[in-house]
């Protein structure tokens, strides 16, 4: 299973990109907004899931773990394939999907091209109670200083990859951001080091 890619963007347009990883170009299906955010020649990191069918292999890429998790839940709903799942995420954020399901409101899904009334209702019913883990961690108080979202997001992904629960990692990142000077939290390496120091071996052992 290809769970993520990090490499150089060779092309990006519409809802797709090609990312060069070690000399191999991977074609990845993305939301249009995600594809537009990529720049040819820049390094990109995407979370991925591979959809295997009898006649094709398709790699879908996502900017965050929450988006990937929602995609996989949507793709598991009867009548919703990967194309419709990525269409939903092209219109709605993971939080908006969770809010609509929590409110038993199928209107946002009916507004997505390719999703009919019956499928929209089925999405709401099928995903009820399954989306709590797909929400992003609460942001720090507005009175607290913040790190650039790309920096804090990258650190959060790294910590989750190291085995910390996303909630624990998110809280630790927020605490470090709130308690350090801007110059000490303006890079992924520095913020990650400070957050790991705060979590400490005792915290890791307690997980």
Curated annotation (Swiss-Prot):
A Pfam entry, by short name: RuvA_N
Keyword set, alphabetical order: Cytoplasm, DNA damage, DNA recombination, DNA repair, DNA-binding
GO cellular component: cytoplasm; Holliday junction helicase complex; Holliday junction resolvase complex
Location of region: Domain II: 64-142
Region (Domain I): 1-63
Role of this protein: The RuvA-RuvB-RuvC complex processes Holliday junction (HJ) DNA during genetic recombination and DNA repair, while the RuvA-RuvB complex plays an important role in the rescue of blocked DNA replication forks via replication fork reversal (RFR). RuvA specifically binds to HJ cruciform DNA, conferring on it an open structure. The RuvB hexamer acts as an ATP-dependent pump, pulling dsDNA into and through the RuvAB complex. HJ branch migration allows RuvC to scan DNA until it finds its consensus sequence, where it cleaves and resolves the cruciform DNA.
Sequence segments annotated as region (Flexible linker): 142-146
Record protein name field: Holliday junction branch migration complex subunit RuvA
Keyword Lyase recorded: no
Similarity section: Belongs to the RuvA family.
Ubl conjugation is among the record's keywords: no
Gene Ontology terms, MF aspect: ATP binding; four-way junction DNA binding; four-way junction helicase activity
Domain topic, free-text comment: Has three domains with a flexible linker between the domains II and III and assumes an 'L' shape. Domain III is highly mobile and contacts RuvB.
Top-level lineage group: Bacteria
Species in which this protein is naturally found: Leifsonia xyli subsp. xyli (strain CTCB07)
Description of how the protein assembles with itself and partners: Homotetramer. Forms an RuvA(8)-RuvB(12)-Holliday junction (HJ) complex. HJ DNA is sandwiched between 2 RuvA tetramers; dsDNA enters through RuvA and exits via RuvB. An RuvB hexamer assembles on each DNA strand where it exits the tetramer. Each RuvB hexamer is contacted by two RuvA subunits (via domain III) on 2 adjacent RuvB subunits; this complex drives branch migration. In the full resolvosome a probable DNA-RuvA(4)-RuvB(12)-RuvC(2) complex forms which resolves the HJ.
Gene of this entry: ruvA
Cellular compartment(s): Cytoplasm
Region (Domain III) location: 147-207
A biological process term (GO) from this entry: DNA recombination
